[in-house]
């Protein structure tokens, strides 16, 4: 069986770029999933590995990072230290492991891969009146810029 770190490397290695769309509840509490409240173009994740055990995650166009950018070393030794990451061939993500009323939100990130295309969905819940409510949804359709055979852009919604 392939270990989680190896699946993570196979899924995510690449220079991923796409347009990020964020949907957030308005003042009345309505969550409109057809009209984004924020678009970030481009959203870029450059994920590279220097050897079998080490790499770098470098992101820009990020919704929650200071200045929209972040860079982190990644390694087999520290991968999934919190136990919230999961990988399968062609799918990977991370999830909050529990609800903590002291934290401002919890979430799930789901990535689905097809060839060198990647669809990422981020779901964020926030507390409201003692309950958790889905507050924000982020979606990015990525293409890998490192691909030798780039895939064409997807048609706009509603087109054949």
Per-region residue spans from a language model:
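Soluble ligand-binding/transfer domains with enclosed cavities or grooves
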Residues: 2-160
